[in-house]
Amino acid sequence: MVTPRTNSPDNSYTREHPERFSTAGPAGPLGYAADTQADLLLDLDLQDPSDARNASRGSERAHRPLVRERASTGVLRQGSGGKRTQECICVGICMTLMVVNFFFIIFHVRIDNLSTILVAAFCGIVTADFGSGLVHWAADTWGSVELPILGKNFLRPFREHHIDPTSITRHDFIETNGDNFMVTIPFLARMVWDFLTLSEDDVQKKFTWNCYVFLLALFVAMTNQIHKWSHTYFGLPGWVVWLQECHVILPRRHHRIHHVAPHETYFCITTGWLNWPLEKLRFWSILEAVIEQTTGCKPRADDMKWAQKGT
């Protein structure tokens, strides 16, 4: 089980403020008297306005009402009736393909190849975790919400998420997962086609690869749902809490590290397995330095500018 680096010598922030990563406190099992989940998580990030790392992001409190107003007026929900229909169709198709592929895999699995299959499945999960981190890092770090199409529809939700982290918990299953489910459909459909059309020998030749793709697709599809669970502090099913505590999926306490301003670490949000090793390798900071040196673009240069405009 991978645990947050609250005592790591190279993470002075979490070491100096261990109380921010505690799940128990004098005010109750979560240590809070917050009236909403949004207050709860924002207070975790901004308990000490004088903290040097949080001072530059202190306006997150001031802009909390703005985000709530946007949510109440539907601004945060960029979708339309057509978008909702597309999401429903994609979720239905994806789940059907997953079930069909699962039964094909069970039917064709061979015990003598089980170890190879398990390794392939594990690699699929790790790939999904890295992919979630790469997308999350890119959206948090680069670009402006003013960009045509991309800014409004892709970057802005990531920036708003840092101001109102629990807004994701107010989305239903379809809205949360529709886009990710859509991404996996071509790959799952190709798997079904292979199982239906290839001979048994050819199926076995591609079986390890298909197991890798299946677990990759499954965890990519569920990334937003897992992320949503990591921000849900009340009413989670027991089996979800168990998966979080065993770090099979992203734990709440682990993901909280990312939500400490300036949101520059722990980007992987599927399982979170890669967050600690990538941080030890300084992967993201080195990548940012290379990009800045090459292009002259500064990471997170656009951060919070959009919110200050009050639009």
Regions found by a protein language model. Name each.
Residues 78-89, 111-117, 202-209:
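Membrane-interfacial loop-to-transmembrane-helix junctions in polytopic alpha-helical membrane proteins
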Residues 1-85, 146-147, 163-174, 201-203, ...:
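Cytosolic/stromal cytosol-facing helical appendages immediately following the last transmembrane segment
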Residues 133-167:
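Membrane-helix interface/capping segments
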Residues 115-124, 198-219:
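Interfacial segments of alpha-helical transmembrane regions
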Residues 94-101, 174-195:
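Core segments of transmembrane alpha-helices
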Residues 115-144, 219-228:
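Hydrophobic alpha-helical membrane-embedded segments
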